[in-house]
Structure formats: C-alpha cells, structure tokens
Amino acid sequence: MSFVKYLRRDNLLQLAGKPSLSRNYILQTCRTLIIETSPPEFVKLNRLSGSDSGIIEVNLDRPVTKNAINKEMLKSLQNAFESIHQDNSARVVMIRSLVPGVFCAGADLKERRTMSPSEVHTYVNSLRYMFSFIEALSIPTIAAIEGAALGGGLEMALACDLRICGENAVFGLPETGLAIIPGAGGTQRLSRLVGRSVSKELIFTGRKIDAIEAANKGLVNICVTAGEAHEKAIEMAQQINEKGPLAIKMAKKAIDEGIETNMASGLEVEEMCYQKLLNTQDRLEGLAAFAEKRKPLYTGN
C-alpha cells in the first residue's frame, strides 16, 4: 500500500475513485513514503461500537520514548490514517495517548542523530505530509491531550480540528533551541490558530505554556481536570456523531476552504456546500424527525 502526499493548489481536484479530501490539497503517489512492511504497533485503532459506531480512536503507544515519532511510528500513523480514509463508516476521529503523562514528545531525536541531512529532509517531509493528511480528512478530528505535546506532538494536535486538554498539559515548539524550525506545519498552523504575534513569540523563544495559558490563547478548545481529556473528547465525539454526517463534512469543508479566501468567495463556498445537501435523504429525515418530535436516524445518504 502506498502512502500519499499533498501539493498546494488553488482549485480542487478529485482523486479517481475516491472522495476529495480537502479544500486545496491533491493526492499524489509519493515513492519516498511507501509503506514497505507492517511496522510495530505503536499506533492502535479502536473502532467504537453500538451507539458510538463511527467514532474511531487513534491510540499512540510508544511508552519507552514518550511517543516520540521515529520512522516506524510514522509508518504506523500512515497505516492507521490510510485505514480511516478508506472506511466509509468513519464519522469522527480522536487521537489520544495510551502513555500516562504525555501526549507526544515530538520527533525521536535519538534516531535523528543517526540520520544524514538527506534522510532528515525525507523524514520531515513525510511527517509534514502525514499531518496534512490528518488535516485534510473530510471528517472531524479531535486531539485529547494529557501531559506534554511538544514539537511534532503539538504539530500533530494542530492538524486536528479540535483540541481538548487536561490541566496537566504542556505545549511548546522548542525547535529553535536546536537551531531548526518547526517543520511539520507548526509555523503555519499555529499562526492561523493563535495569530502571528503569539506564534512568533512561542516559536522564537521556544517557551512552554501550560493548559490554562493554552486555553486563554485559543490553542485548545476546552481545558478539563487532569485525566478527563479523553472522557470529554468522547463526549464531544458523541455530540458530533449524532448529527447528519454529510452536513458535518460540508460544514468542515465550508469553514476550511472559506477561511483561506475573502468573504465573497467564502460565501460562494458555503452556498456550494449547502446546495450539495438539499437532495439528501438525511435532510428529509431531519425535517421528518423534527415534525414527529423524535431523534433523527441519519444514514449518510
């Protein structure tokens, strides 16, 4: 199975036989990102069932390195999200850590020391494309953060639509202290989320911030008692899962594509997304359920 990379583009293109993933990314085979063998299970998928069917947990589990992402863990991430992309029943994705006290410590710097500049270039590009893949999923993504989310770990959380953290969470992009910069989307996504000035301060200084400051700056959506981020993320995923799945996809598309352009163009995107929902069975089901004062049963059609 081959992984994919994204190239920036103004117009939307459709991947043959698959739904478009995002506003201005196109999929292209990337030879440098071929998954050659089954990697160790550093990333484990958990598909919830029953009334929670459609919610998928992506569990990070590399305790020896505090979930630092080496080549093998990156392959595990690629496998996991390729599987989610292929799953038509997926409605909400949540990324969490199974390692107590840490979300993700970033890249594996011990492995990095053994790499040539060319190998580092390939690895960082692969990580950047991986996080762009997460961002470009048509369904909502939630990061449930306990403990440290540093470097590439924070960049992974930034690629998600929503972030929920425990009070014990710590955030930072310390790369300038290593004479490099955040290379997996941090300079771009952080700036778009918290603003240019705050982003520059955090990246220039490499300063770590706690959960309360992160919430005040808008870096996270919700801060809860330590140890309760997963529970809160499940609650939010359940709320999303109850809504019309096509509507959720179109809402994400309208917001993500519209925010990158001017108001007039953004309203055109909104109109296009709304139009796509008018002839769906789910829209009729929503109206019928409202009239009959019952819970709607959405099928994604």
Swiss-Prot record:
It comes from the Eukaryota. GO terms for cellular component: cytosol; mitochondrion. The keyword Nucleotide-binding does not apply. Its EC number is 4.2.1.17. It catalyses: a (3S)-3-hydroxyacyl-CoA = a (2E)-enoyl-CoA + H2O; a 4-saturated-(3S)-3-hydroxyacyl-CoA = a (3E)-enoyl-CoA + H2O. The record marks E175 as: Important for catalytic activity. Residues 1-32 form a transit peptide. The keyword Phosphoprotein does not apply. GO terms for molecular function: enoyl-CoA hydratase activity; methylglutaconyl-CoA hydratase activity; peptidase activity. Pathway: Lipid metabolism; fatty acid beta-oxidation. Pfam families: ECH_1. It is an enzyme of class 4 (lyase). Straight-chain enoyl-CoA thioesters from C4 up to at least C16 are processed, although with decreasing catalytic rate. PANTHER family: ENOYL-COA HYDRATASE-RELATED, SD19268P. This is Probable enoyl-CoA hydratase 2, mitochondrial.
